[in-house]
Swiss-Prot record:
Function recorded in the entry: Molecular chaperone. Has ATPase activity.
Chain intervals for the UniProt region annotation (B): 343-559
Similarity-based family: Belongs to the heat shock protein 90 family.
Protein's name in the database: Chaperone protein HtpG
Naturally occurring in which organism (per UniProt): Ectopseudomonas mendocina (strain ymp)
Length: 634
C-alpha cells in the first residue's frame, strides 16, 4: 500500500453518532450479527457491479468471478472481510460511511426509549449495516476502490466509532472493498475460523455469492506450506431458485433478514415459480412488525428485482400496489430484458400481468394466515391494518378479497380490539337483516355508548365500530360486501327494513304526525343551525341526536380536510328527537318561548357533544345551562 495522500479528518453526522452509541449498547447481546450485516453489504456491492457491467463490461477488469473472503489474525486480533464488488469512490465513502441518507431518521431516533430490548428491535428494523462493525471492534479500517477508477484512486477510511473519521487517498490495485476490524478486548472469539464458519452458516448460507475462508489444516496437514488455500463455506446459490421442498424454514427466515434488513422473523412467506406465458419466480414475505417509516409515503418500498438471476434494482415498487408496500422479497423474471429501467417498468404490459398475479398471491397468503394462524393474523392486523384499509380505494378488482381481510371492533366484540371480520358479522345477522351496520367516530370510548346505537342494542343488532382516521374515507369506497350494503347508522333517515314490524312503522308515522307542531317550534328555535328537524327512530334512552345528511361529510373526513388545509364544504346536521323522553315532553309543554329556545339550544349542544363534535359557542352553552340550574334550584 502506498503512502496516504489528501488525508482529512471529518465529523460524523449527528444521527450517526446517536445511532452508533445506541447500537453498541442495545445490540451487544446479539453481537454476531455484525458479520451478517457486512456480508449483506458485500453481496449488494457484487449485485451492483454485475448490473453496471451490463452496460460497461470493462468494469469487471478481467475478473468476473465475484466472491467474498473472510480471514482473521489471532495475534493481531483482527477480522478482515474483502469483496471484489463495485467498491466506492472517495465521495461515496464520505457519503455512505459518515451519514445516514434515510427519510425519517430523526423521527426514528425520537422513538428510541432507552429500553435496550425494545431499542434493539427498532434499530434492527432500521438496518444498521456497516455501523454494526463497532459492536465488536474499537477501530475499523476500510480500503476501497470503485470499479472503473485507477489504482491510484483507492480510499482508506478509518474510525474508532466515536465522533470522527479519517479519509485518505491510497494506492489499491484491486477493485472492491476490504474491511479490517480491530477487535475490542474480550471479543477475540471472532478471530477464529470455526466461529466465523458457524456464523456464516447460520446467517448467510443463502447468499448467492461464494463466501470463502482459509482452509484449516489439522493433524499431519497442520504444517502445510504458508500459501493460503480458500474454501467456500456457504451454499452460494440464490435461495429462490431452489425447489421449495429443499429449503428449510430457518433458511427462508435468514434470507428474509437479509433482504428486509430486519432482525425478526417474518410472519409468513410465499415462494412460487410461474411457468408458461409468463416465467418468473417470486419469494414474498409478510414482516412481523411495521417499519418505523411505514407512513412516510416517500420511504423506499418494493421488491428486489432480478432478471435471469442478475440483480437489476432495489425497491422496484411497480410489482405491488401501494397498499401492500410493507411486503418484502424478491422477484426474478425471465421475460424482462437485462437493460430494463424504472421508466420501462412503468410502461411494460408484462409488469401489469405480474403485478396482478403477485397482488393476488399476497392476498391469498394473508387469507391463509388469517384462517390457519388467527393469533398471528391479529399481530399482522395491528401492524399493517390501517395500510391494508387503503386497498378498496386503490384496487377495485380485489375489493371484495381485501374487504374479507379487514377487521373491526364491534358492539358484539370484546372491547376496542379490531378482531371482527365481515364474515364473522354476516354469520351473526338477524333474520331479515340485509344490511351491514357501522358507526364511525374518534375513539372507541366515544362511540361505544353513542345514542345512535340505542335502537340497535334494543333489537340485538350488531354494529361495527370504526375509529381509525381512515375509516370514513374507506367506507366511501367500500359500499357492499357479499351482496349486502353498508349503512352508516348516523347518516340519513334510518330504515331498518324488515327488522321493523309493520306495527312499528305505523306507530312511527302516527307519532311524527302528532308532533308536527313541536317540529315547527324546534325549527324556529334552531333556525339556520340545522338542515331538518324530525322525530327519531334511533333513540330509546336519549332525548336527541344529530344525524348526518346522506351526502354530507362526516366528522372524521371534515377533520382530515381541515388538518390538510383544504376547504371543507359547509353542511348542517339533522336534529332528531325522542318524543317519549321526559325532557322532550317537558319541552313540548313549555309555554314560555324564551325558555323553550334556551332548552332547545341546550339539547342541540348536548347532542353535538355526544356525536364527538365541538361546540361553536361553548360560552353560550354554559350560560344557558347555568341559567337553567339557577331556575331549578330556586
Amino acid at each position: 500500500m502506498s503512502v496516504e495522500t489528501q488525508k482529512e479528518t471529518l465529523g460524523f453526522q449527528t444521527e450517526v453518532k446517536q445511532l452508533l452509541h445506541l447500537m453498541i449498547h442495545s445490540l451487544y447481546s446479539n453481537k454476531e450479527i455484525f458479520l451478517r450485516e457486512l456480508i449483506s453489504n458485500a453481496s449488494d456491492a457484487a449485485d451492483k457491479l454485475r448490473f453496471e457491467a451490463l452496460a460497461k463490461p470493462e468494469l469487471l477488469e478481467g475478473g468476473a468471478e465475484l466472491k467474498i473472503r473472510l480471514s482473521f489474525d489471532k495475534d493481531a486480533k483482527t477480522v478482515t472481510l474483502e469483496d471484489n464488488g463495485i467498491g466506492m469512490s472517495r465521495d461515496e465513502v464520505i457519503a455512505h460511511l459518515g451519514t445516514i441518507a434515510k427519510s425519517g431518521t430523526a423521527d426514528f431516533l425520537k422513538n428510541l426509549s432507552g429500553d435496550q430490548k425494545k431499542d434493539s428491535h427498532l434499530i434492527g428494523q432500521f438496518g444498521v449495516g456497516f455501523y454494526s462493525a463497532f459492536i465488536v471492534a474499537d477501530k475499523v479500517d476500510v480500503f476501497t476502490r470503485r470499479a472503473g477508477l485507477s489504482a491510484a484512486e483507492g480510499v482508506h477510511w478509518s474510525s474508532k466509532g466515536e465522533g470522527e473519521f479519517e479519509v485518505a487517498t491510497v494506492e489499491k490495485a484491486e477493485r472492491g472493498t476490504r474491511i479490517v476490524l480491530h477487535l475490542k478486548s474480550g471479543e477475540e472469539e471472532f478471530a477464529d475460523g470455526w466461529r466465523l464458519r458457524n456464523i456464516v452458516k447460520k446467517y448467510s448460507d443463502h447468499i448467492a455469492l461464494p463466501i470463502e475462508l482459509p482452509k484449516e489444516h489439522y493433524g499431519e496437514e497442520k504444517d502445510k506450506p504458508a500459501e493460503v488455500e480458500w474454501e467456500t463455506v456457504n451454499r452460494a446459490s440464490a435461495l429462490w431458485t431452489r425447489p421449495r421442498a429443499e429449503v428449510k424454514d430457518e433458511e427462508y427466515q435468514e434470507f428474509y433478514k437479509h433482504v428486509a434488513h430486519d432482525f425478526e422473523n417474518p410472519l409468513t412467506w410465499s415462494h412460487n415459480k410461474v411457468e408458461g406465458k409468463l416465467e418468473y419466480t417470486s419469494l414474498l414475505y409478510v414482516p412481523g412488525r411495521a417499519p418505523f417509516d411505514l407512513y412516510h409515503r416517500e420511504a423506499p418500498k418494493g421488491l428486489k428485482l432480478y432478471v435471469q438471476r442478475v440483480f437489476i434494482m432495489d425497491q422496484a415498487d411497480e410489482f405491488l400496489p401501494l397498499y401492500l408496500r410493507f411486503i418484502k422479497g424478491v422477484v426474478d423474471s425471465n421475460d424482462l430484458s437485462l437493460n430494463v429501467s424504472r421508466e420501462i417498468l412503468q410502461k411494460d404490459p408484462v409488469i401489469d400481468s405480474m403485478k396482478s398475479a403477485l397482488t393476488k398471491r399476497v392476498l391469498d397468503m394473508l387469507e391463509k394466515l388469517a384462517k390457519d394462524k388467527p393469533e398471528e393474523y391479529k399481530a399482522f392486523w395491528k401492524a399493517f391494518g390501517q395500510v391494508l384499509k387503503e386497498g378498496p380505494a386503490e384496487d377495485f378488482a380485489n375489493k371484495e378479497k381485501i374487504a374479507g381481510l379487514l377487521r373491526f371492533a364491534s358492539t358484539a366484540g370484546e372491547g376496542d380490539e379490531q378482531s371482527v371480520s365481515l364474515a364473522d358479522y354476516l354469520g351473526r345477522v338477524k333474520d331479515g337483516q340485509d344490511k351491514i351496520y357501522y358507526l364511525t367516530g374518534e375513539s372507541y370510548a366515544q362511540i361505544k355508548n353513542s345514542p345512535h346505537l340505542e335502537v340497535f342494542r334494543k333489537k340485538g343488532i350488531e354494529v361495527l365500530l370504526l375509529t381509525d382516521r381512515i375509516d370514513e374515507w374507506l367506507m366511501s369506497y367500500l359500499t357492499e360486501f357479499d351482496g349486502k350494503q353498508f349503512v352508516d347508522v348516523a347518516r340519513g333517515d334510518l330504515d331498518l327494513g324488515k327488522l321493523d314490524s309493520e306495527e312499528d312503522k305505523k306507530a312511527q308515522e302516527e307519532v311524527a304526525k302528532a308532533k308536527e307542531g313541536l317540529i315547527e317550534r324546534l325549527k324556529g328555535a334552531l333556525g339556520e343551525q340545522v338542515k331538518e328537524v324530525r322525530v327519531s327512530h334511533r333513540l330509546t334512552d336519549s332525548p336527541a341526536i344529530l344525524a348526518i345528511g346522506e351526502q354530507d361529510l362526516g366528522l372524521q373526513m371534515r377533520q382530515i380536510l381541515e388538518a390538510s388545509g383544504q376547504k371543507v364544504p359547509e353542511s348542517k346536521p339533522i336534529f332528531e328527537f325522542n318524543p317519549s323522553h321526559p325532557l322532550i315532553e317537558r319541552l313540548d309543554a313549555e309555554a314560555d318561548e324564551d325558555r323553550f329556545v334556551d332548552l332547545t339550544h341546550i339539547l342541540f349542544d348536548q347532542a353535538a357533544l355526544a356525536a364527538g363534535d365541538s361546540l361553536k359557542d361553548p360560552a353560550a352553552y354554559v350560560q344557558r345551562l347555568n341559567k337553567l340550574l339557577v331556575e331549578l334550584s330556586a
